[in-house]
Amino acid sequence: QIMLQPAATSNGLLLLERAETDAPAPFDWHNATVYFVLTDRFENGDPSNDQSYERHKDGMAEIGTFHGGDLRGLINKLDYLQQLGVNALWISAPFEQIHGWVGGGTKGDFPHYAYHGYYTQDWTNLDANMGNEADLRTLVDSAHQRGIRILFDVVMNHTGYATLADMQEYQFGALYLSGDEVKKTLGERWSDWKPAAGQTWHSFNDYINFSDKTGWDKWWGKNWIRTDIGDYDNPGFDDL
């Protein structure tokens, strides 16, 4: 006979488990345990890439700035995710995003960077804030060793906005400013611009001439297609 007695601190609860466990069932997407990660806000594994492309903090609430999470941070947390029973890791789009910021919120009260991966600029490159191709390969290989699949979020609905930083870096688009007005208004580095009294972070758009076709040819090119989304109201005009 074997006598089993609950521990004094278990409130009378006694748990029995099999010594031998069944082999894990084959992976099936219908029964996958998917964990979604907004990579930038998850784990900072490499602080050296936190301010790639001269991105910087706003010195306020940091609502729309990059916080440092990256692919190396995901690698560091794979054991934790495995312990949770995760077998599919869905990560925010790691593609290269617009380098600069746009106005954040309906009131434009903060600068908004593409930390979420929604404003892709180059679908063929990784964003430097996320890491490099070696980091991505290590993440995928290390995840597979733990039985975890890696999924990319792919945001095809829209691409990146025009920002002052990208316009200056890639020399596309057109401004309503000219000559000395440019440096006087936007500064040496356009991405350092901040709203003055009576302005918001949306106000940088007031300096951009979106109707200058010649200035935007380098950005859009000749072979692009635009299509609207079903069930969205058509405003009756084209912002492009």
Predicted regions and their residues:
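Extended acidic/polar, glycine-enriched regions
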Residues: Q1-E20
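Substrate-binding/active-site clefts of carbohydrate-active enzymes
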Residues: P26-A32, F42-L240
